[in-house]
Regions:
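Conserved interdomain linker/interface between the two RecA-like ATPase lobes of SF2 helicase motors
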Residues: 1-38
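Long, largely alpha-helical accessory region at the distal end of helicase-like NTP-driven motors
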Residues: 17, 23, 28-29, 40, ...
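Conserved helicase ATPase core of P-loop NTP-dependent helicases/translocases
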Residues: 35, 45-46, 59-108
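Phosphate- and divalent-cation-binding pockets in alpha/beta enzyme and binding domains
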Residues: 43-50, 109, 130
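Short glycine-/polar-rich loops that comprise or flank the Walker A/P-loop
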Residues: 60-64, 114-118, 126, 143-150
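Conserved segment of the helicase C-terminal RecA-like domain
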Residues: 128-133, 137-171
Length: 196
């Protein structure tokens, strides 16, 4: 379905679905510290506002999220990154931890928030570079984080044969290996990772 209607991503039903799946697949650590990649500024703002009105089932409190885009100042970005990395016991009246940052136009590269334990992709891309950059936001090791959960609601990994190749870990670029990997559907990624 190349012509999916991405405007439906902000519907209440879709928001509930995203939250249900994010809760089901979970995260490593004491609390979620997630990045959500969106298609537009409007989408980040609407989704953040809707999440902030919903109770996080893991902790019984409203989600705390923020929408960030290219118009945010460097100070606003740094503040958001610090809040995302915070634990509950570090909260104070001035700063509360964030559960998610909704992002468009930024965070693909050059950002290092090692505590990120969940990445949600709501943005379509045909670019294996952008896909791997977004995926990579959660791949850094951190104390208390054993793994990262990547939820690709768009199915970017199926849209471009270069993405499964990038995920395969095979750097030989042997045509027979690539053909076999693509024909198998890349269901199992090397290591302890799977695609569902």
């Amino acid at each position: 379905e190349a012509n999916r209607d991405f405007s439906m991503l902000t519907s209440d039903e879709r928001v509930k679905h995203i939250i249900t799946q994010a809760d089901y697949y979970g995260y490593s650590g004491d609390k979620v510290k997630g990045l959500i990649f969106c298609s537009s500024i409007k989408e980040t703002e609407e989704l953040s506002a809707k999440f902030n009105q919903i109770t996080n089932p893991a902790i019984g409190k409203l989600y705390r999220t923020i929408a960030l885009n290219g118009r945010a100042s460097e100070q606003e970005r740094q503040d958001a990154f610090e809040r995302l990395a915070m634990n509950e016991d570090e909260a104070n009246e001035e700063k509360q931890p964030l559960d998610y940052i909704f992002s468009v136009e930024i965070l693909n590269e050059g950002v290092d928030i090692v505590e990120v334990n969940q990445v949600i992709m709501l943005r379509p891309t045909q670019s294996p570079i952008v896909f791997i950059q977004q995926l990579g936001r959660g791949l850094r090791k951190a104390n208390g984080k054993e793994y990262v959960v990547i939820l690709d609601f768009i199915g970017n990994y199926t849209n471009n044969f270069m993405i499964p190749i990038a995920l395969s870990g095979d750097r030989t670029y042997n045509k027979d290996n690539i053909r076999r990997y693509i024909m198998e559907g890349g269901r199992v990624i090397p290591g302890a990772s799977t695609v569902h």
